[in-house]
């Protein structure tokens, strides 16, 4: 790792809050030639009401946009987890005038940009966007700066995701035991309690005991719901 990257990593690791970490990324984005930066973190659960946190220096007029959900405080909530417009680990270069998804931001000076979404082992998705109002991103420039932006997106998600873990992943999830994860794995495979008992060589009574415990830890209503939530937060497969 270069000395410059090592220094940047130290600054990120020294961040005491997600907002502090975002400010470090914002500064680097400016150095790369972008006026605007936004980072969006979407929690994996609740499944139908996923919480979203956004840090941004986008114009205030864009704050109401369901696409950007730009809230500098980081406390904005948007239940549309697909609004980021990109899939995990796939970069997107956009021109707002040409792309309906971003068109409403062009009048606010946000026209050309780049975005990447990263999904972590807990199922949380972080989307980093860099944008500017003038000068299209040409291939020559992209070849030069995209490796750095991809690295920034992963580092931003690693840092901000960790700082926001208590907000995105309920603490009880970390206490799910290996046996409970194995039971949920076989539940997800459609096995009955009796079949799981035979597979794990445990009594039906013990299986039911562990199911009751893990359903409570995951805040689920039944074992099927627990298996779905466990899959989304990366607890299974084991």
From Swiss-Prot:
UniProt similarity note: Belongs to the autoinducer-regulated transcriptional regulatory protein family.
SMART domains per record: HTH_LUXR
Q: Supply the InterPro entries for this chain.
A: Sig_transdc_resp-reg_C-effctor, TF_LuxR_autoind-bd_dom, TF_LuxR_autoind-bd_dom_sf, Tscrpt_reg_LuxR_C, WH-like_DNA-bd_sf
Instruction: Print the miscellaneous field.
Output: Thailandamide is a polyketide that is toxic to human cell lines but also has antibacterial activity on E.coli, S.typhimurium and S.aureus. It probably acts on acetyl-CoA carboxylase in the fatty acid synthesis pathway, which is rarely found to be an antibiotic target. These data suggest it might be a good starting point for engineering of novel antibiotics.
- The residue ranges marked as DNA-binding region are 193-212
Q: What is the lineage of its organism?
A: Bacteria, Pseudomonadati, Pseudomonadota, Betaproteobacteria, Burkholderiales
Q: Which Gene3D superfamilies match?
A: Transcription factor LuxR-like, autoinducer-binding domain (3.30.450.80), Winged helix-like DNA-binding domain superfamily/Winged helix DNA-binding domain (1.10.10.10)
Q: Sorted alphabetically, which keywords does the UniProt record give?
A: DNA-binding, Transcription, Transcription regulation
Observed effect of gene inactivation: No production of thailandamide antibiotic. When the promoter region is disrupted (121 bases before the start codon) thailandamide production increases. In 2 other promoter disruption mutants (617 and 624 bases before the start codon) this bacterium no longer inhibits growth of Salmonella in an overlay assay, suggesting no thailandamide is produced.
Alphabetically, the GO molecular function entries are: DNA binding
Residue span(s) of domain HTH luxR-type:
169-234
One GO term under biological process is:
regulation of DNA-templated transcription
Question: What is the gene called?
Answer: thaA
Relate the protein's function as given in its record.
Represses thailandamide production.
Q: What is this protein called?
A: Transcriptional repressor ThaA
Q: Give the originating organism.
A: Burkholderia thailandensis (strain ATCC 700388 / DSM 13276 / CCUG 48851 / CIP 106301 / E264)
């Amino acid at each position: 790792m270069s000395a410059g990257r090592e220094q940047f990593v130290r600054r990120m690791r020294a961040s005491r809050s997600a907002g502090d970490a975002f400010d470090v990324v914002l500064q680097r984005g400016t150095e790369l030639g972008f006026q605007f930066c936004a980072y969006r973190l979407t929690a994996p659960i609740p499944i139908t009401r996923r919480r979203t946190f956004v840090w941004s220096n986008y114009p205030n007029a864009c704050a109401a946009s369901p696409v950007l959900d730009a809230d500098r405080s980081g406390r904005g909530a948007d239940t549309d987890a697909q609004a980021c417009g990109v899939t995990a680990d796939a970069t997107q270069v956009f021109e707002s005038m040409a792309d309906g998804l971003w068109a409403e931001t062009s009048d606010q000076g946000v026209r050309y940009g780049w975005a990447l979404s990263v999904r972590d082992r807990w199922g949380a998705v972080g989307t980093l966007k860099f944008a500017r109002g003038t000068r299209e991103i040409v291939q020559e420039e992209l070849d030069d700066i995209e490796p750095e932006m991809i690295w920034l997106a992963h580092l931003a998600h690693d840092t901000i995701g960790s700082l926001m873990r208590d907000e995105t992943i309920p603490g009880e999830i970390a206490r799910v035991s290996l046996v409970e994860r194995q039971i949920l794995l076989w539940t997800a495979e459609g096995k009955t309690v009796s079949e799981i008992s035979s597979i794990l060589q445990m009594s039906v009574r013990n299986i039911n005991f562990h199911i009751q415990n893990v359903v409570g830890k995951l805040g689920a209503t039944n074992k099927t719901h627990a298996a779905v939530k466990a899959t989304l937060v990366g607890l299974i497969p084991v």
